[in-house]
Each structure stands twice: as C-alpha cells, then as structure tokens.
Amino acid sequence: MELMNLSCEGFLEELASKAAAPGGGGASALVGAAGVALGSMVGSLTVGKKKYAAVEADIVALNVRAEALRKRLEALVQADAEAFLPVAAAYKLPKETPEQQAHKAAVLEKALDRACAVPLEVMTACGEGIALAAEYAEKGSVLARSDAGCAALFCKAAMQAAGLNVKVNTRLMADKAHADALEARAEQLLAEFVPQADMVYQSVSNE
C-alpha cells in the first residue's frame, strides 16, 4: 500500500487501525512534510510582491529547497512503514535451537538498525525544515509569518516524535555501543534544532 496515495481520511483510518504501520514514525514524517509545506506557503505568498522584491531571489531559492525537502519527507512516510516489516518478521523467527537463536538475533539486529535509520533521516530532514522556517519567518511576507511559526513547530514536533522512534529501537539492540551512537546522533539533532524552532515561535508570537 502506497501510504501517500491515500486520502487524508484514509491515512488517518490506517493510522488509527490495529495495523502495525503506519505508526508514530510515518506520522512524524507526514507532520514534518506538512511543516515544510507551510514554509512553502509563506514563500508562495511572498514571491511576486513588490514589497519583497529585494528578497525574491532568496525566497525562490528557499522554495526550491522546500519542495525537494517535502518530497523527501513524503517518501520517508512509506520508508518507515517498510522498515518496520523486517522487525516484525524477525520476531516471528523460530528460536528452538542455538543456531536458530543466533540467526534470529542477527536478523533482528540488522532490522532494528534499519528501523533506526529512517527516523534519523526524518529528524535530519525536519532540522532542515526548521532552518527553512527560520528563513521564511525572517524574509517572507509578514502576512504569513504565523505560518512560518507553525512550520517550525510542526517540524519540531515531528523531529521529537521521530527521536522517540529511534530510542524505542535502540533499546532493543544487542550492540549497545552502536545503539549509544545512534541515540547520540538523535540527541545532537534535537539540541541543535529544537532551540531554533523555539526562537522562530517566540519571534512570531511576540510580534
């Protein structure tokens, strides 16, 4: 099932169902994509306005980056669902013999690593979305500054939620050093971009 081909209602019905995917990871990617789309909205409302002629080239460049970023996050909605399937399959492998147990452990470890990789990609993309939102808030139409603030908040929430999906998988890993490295990367992204998102929100809300 191609999740991005579903209607909004169809996606939400799948999300609300007992199906294992989509779940928090896919929803995070979708929320991030919505945040980036809000940034693009600011750009669309700015381009062509005489008042913003001095920054038009900058806004056009932002719009190109934002469109590519939104497409990346849309693809990650599907990628997250597909990354979960091997984890679920690994748990169903037999473990009657030592050989089966070793095989199951190896397959599960590999699947968990991939299940961490996708939400880390979502986090990275959302960080880029927050940076874009900051530029849209600074240079875009004042009539749409609240949308730039919403863009930053959406991407922040999506990043934090994706971070939870990293942790839920690293906690199951046998290779604790690798798990710690993945968690450290997630924490680094949060430390870098959450304050930036908060600054965008404050600058918009205090106007």
Model-flagged regions — what are they?
Residues 41-53:
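Transmembrane signal-anchor/signal-peptide helices with a preference for the extracytoplasmic
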Residues 129-132, 144-203, 207:
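Preference for long, well-ordered alpha-helical segments
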Residues 50-89, 189:
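A structural-propensity feature for long, helix-poor, extended segments
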Residues 3-22:
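Short, hydrophobic/aliphatic alpha-helical segments
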Residues 30-34, 62, 69-76, 115-125, ...:
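Amphipathic alpha-helix face/heptad-repeat signature
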Residues 17-40, 144-162:
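Conserved phosphate/anionic-ligand binding catalytic regions in large, soluble enzymes, centered on
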Residues 80, 84-153, 157:
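Amphipathic alpha-helical interface segments
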Residues 7, 11, 34-41, 83, ...:
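Amphipathic, well-ordered alpha-helical segments in soluble domains
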